[in-house]
Amino acid sequence: MAKVLIKKLASSVQLPTYKTSGASGMDLMAFISETIILKPQSSCLVPTGISVAFSEEFEIQIRPRSGLAAKNNVSVLNTPGTIDSDYRGEIKVILFNHGNNEFIINNNDRIAQMILTPVVKMELEETETLPETIRGEGGFGSTGK
């Protein structure tokens, strides 16, 4: 288990939690003073009231909650959102309402989940040619349905 330091930005903030022993993500809660009405086909930035610190071997990914997506057509817009190891500001979640009905966000509503994920850094090596593959340059549906 990797250690993540967490700072409450107000005493009444609810800390993220794993809801089951098998959960890979901790639920993030909205920390808002007034209800947010998320209109259809619109986005909003929802504060969580927390900031974190962790090893640079990791990132935290912010992902949608499947229940919000399936039942309310609401998801995290920049999925997955990335919290870099050197970011110390408040975690905020960009929610998007894909549906046709308004979506109400109240304080302490579970709005997303965060997952600690290992990061493997790339070493780029410039080249004039790349190795051939069967697929080649085919993309965007080139392998069939």
Located regions from the model:
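DUTPase catalytic domain/fold
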Residues: 1-145
